[in-house]
Regions:
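DEDD superfamily 3′-5′ metal-dependent exonuclease/proofreading module
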Residues: 1-204
Length: 204
């Protein structure tokens, strides 16, 4: 496993020619309040890039080009949050997207455990540690444990998508999943605009 650490942006996009797995680390769970600290990406070849985002930085041309490339699928787990913080920070909408959490909810209806750790354990037989999830991602220097954790969140998303796609096809829910994925950028905008805790489709 190769992990490359960068500051401010990806140096280039040479490794990213197909679908890309993406995750983010922030100072908290409120996109309108808490800043983006790290963007981690994996091209699906067993390697990962961990990009530290300095406070106040909003100009990452290679990252923004990748996020907005209509020909490259972006794979997230809980894309709703990541899309919101990326939009808040860089002012761009990431499309097209795939969310493994939504795919899990549409297929693994026999359980309420849809966290990445639980899905990877059951679907792929892979154990990942979440010990560093609640740590100071805004630190000037990340620890080796933080870097390894960040990479682990994206290294398996391509394989997980493949397996969840098989389950979506088996259950006849592919079109429903695709419709959900298309709506995600708008859902992220609603969250940032003040409707994060409200179901606008509810009767009351």
């Amino acid at each position: 496993m190769t992990i490359r650490l960068h500051r401010g942006d990806l140096p280039d996009l040479a490794r990213y020619q197909g679908a890309v797995a993406i995750d983010t680390e922030t100072m908290g769970l409120q996109p309108a309040r808490d800043r983006l600290c790290v963007v981690q990406l994996a091209p699906g070849d067993g390697s990962a890039d961990v990009v530290q985002i300095p406070q106040g930085a909003a100009d990452a041309p290679n990252l923004k080009a990748l996020l907005t490339d209509a020909n490259r699928l972006k794979i997230f787990h809980f894309a709703r949050f990541d899309l919101a913080i990326l939009l808040q920070t860089f002012g761009v909408k990431a499309t097209p997207v795939y969310c493994t959490k939504i795919a899990s909810r549409l297929t693994r209806t026999y359980t309420d455990k849809h966290g990445l750790k639980d899905i990877l354990r059951e679907v792929l037989g892979i154990e990942v540690s979440k010990q560093q999830q609640l740590s100071d991602w805004g630190a000037e220097k990340l620890t080796d444990a933080q870097i390894a954790y960040a990479a682990s969140d994206v290294l398996h998303l391509h394989a997980l998508k493949t397996r969840l796609d098989e389950m979506l096809a088996r259950e006849g829910r592919e079109r429903l999943a695709e419709a959900c994925f298309r709506f995600l950028p708008a859902r992220a905008e609603l969250d940032l605009a003040g409707w994060a805790g409200e179901d606008i489709f509810a009767h009351s």
